[in-house]
Amino acid sequence: MRKRPPFLSFALIPVIVALVLALVPTAFAGKPGGGGSSSLSLVLMDGATQAAHNGRITFNVSTTATDRPFVGLRCWQGTTWIYDAYVGYFPDAMFDPWFTLGSPSWADGIAANCTARLFYYDRRGNQKLLTTMSFPVAQ
């Protein structure tokens, strides 16, 4: 078995270092910076004192991670998934910035639990989660 000359091993070190330095910024491109912050809070609408079936809600949204934040809202009655909706919280978003808590799957007289997710879509169309919050919905 032939032994490699030692200078070849040392010659590879700068090549490996150069590759690492070139690829690391690419690997992290498009990801939010460590200094970003996000918050999400529930806002009841139409004079409501609690979130309720067929009631309207919206959210106070704040983030430095993107200028096109979305809120995805999912609700369950027990283990049954009953509601799934998405709203953009930016000026040219397609729909109104509120949710009406109702669907054909939503059973009357049964309380629900909802989880809101603040996120954005990266350049590849993947959702990037910023924060979440959960809240009960009265029957």
Question: Where are the predicted features?
Answer:
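Short, surface-exposed loop/turn segments at beta-strand-coil junctions that are enriched for proline
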Residues: 101-109
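Short beta-strand elements
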Residues: 124-139
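Bacterial N-terminal signal peptides that target proteins for export
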Residues: 2-13
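Short, aromatic- and glycine-rich surface loops/edge beta-strands on solvent-exposed regions
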Residues: 109-123
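Bacterial N-terminal signal peptides
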Residues: 11-22
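Short, compositionally biased P/S/T/A/G/V-rich stretches that sit at domain boundaries
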Residues: 28-58, 62-64, 137-139
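Solvent-exposed serine/threonine-rich low-complexity stretches and specific carbohydrate-binding patches
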Residues: 79-100
